[in-house]
């Protein structure tokens, strides 16, 4: 019954309910926490991003467990929210913070996630996966996307991540990407993706490449 009651909260809350939700989550433990977090996210959702941050940060600052509020900060996703979650990542709430960092929809997360991928072996491949999604949906030029995919591919150890990066390199349609993905045709695990990327690039550049 209690879980159902918390779930029902999700759709009937507004910014004025955050105080009550904060009291609930501070007392709660276990399986009901995600429902209360979702209710908190919904409560501030109508507000602009900066206002979402300003509304929730007082509760973060006075909480004995700031990570309870990371999903709300991740939804806000402004630079201050990112900085606050990173403080937890570099402090006592590494995994809780990382789980929220990969849900932030902000182009500034590209560099943050790359640095995590370089320095945090446990979370490297998940960080690269999210990094790749953000680069793909960004407004960067094809050359810039090639550069960002290339550096990720250099440190990717998971074959699924490698193949995804190779596929996206193909979508840049650049000569530089063609030269790079050809190197992956000799590896059985990446050969199929590399061959497809080569075909994609060549089909878009047949005149330029002498086809």
Predicted regions and their residues:
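Alpha-helical, heptad-rich or low-complexity scaffold/stalk segments
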Residues: 24, 99, 125-133, 160-167, ...
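Amphipathic alpha-helical scaffolding segments comprising HEAT/armadillo-like alpha-solenoid repeats
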Residues: 1, 14-26, 47-60, 78-89, ...
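Long beta-sheet-rich domains in secretory-pathway and surface-associated proteins
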Residues: 156-158, 175, 193
């Amino acid at each position: 019954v209690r879980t159902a009651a918390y779930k029902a909260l999700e759709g009937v809350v507004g910014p004025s309910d955050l105080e009550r939700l904060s009291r609930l989550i501070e007392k709660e433990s276990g399986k009901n926490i995600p429902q209360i977090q979702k209710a908190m996210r919904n409560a501030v959702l109508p507000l602009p991003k900066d206002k979402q941050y300003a509304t929730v940060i007082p509760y973060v600052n006075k909480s004995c467990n700031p990570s309870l509020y990371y999903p709300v900060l991740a939804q806000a996703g402004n630079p201050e929210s990112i900085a606050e979650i990173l403080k937890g990542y570099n402090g006592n709430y590494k995994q809780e913070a990382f789980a929220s960092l990969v849900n932030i929809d902000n182009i500034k997360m590209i560099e943050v996630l790359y640095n995590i991928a370089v320095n945090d072996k446990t979370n490297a491949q998940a960080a690269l996966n999210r990094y790749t999604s953000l680069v793909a949906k960004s407004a960067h030029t094809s050359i810039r996307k090639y550069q960002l995919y290339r550096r990720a591919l250099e440190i990717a150890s998971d074959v699924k991540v490698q193949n995804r990066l190779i596929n996206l390199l193909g979508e840049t349609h650049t000569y530089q990407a063609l030269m790079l993905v050809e190197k992956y045709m000799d590896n059985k695990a990446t050969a199929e993706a590399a061959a497809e990327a080569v075909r994609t690039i060549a089909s878009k550049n047949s005149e330029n490449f002498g086809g």
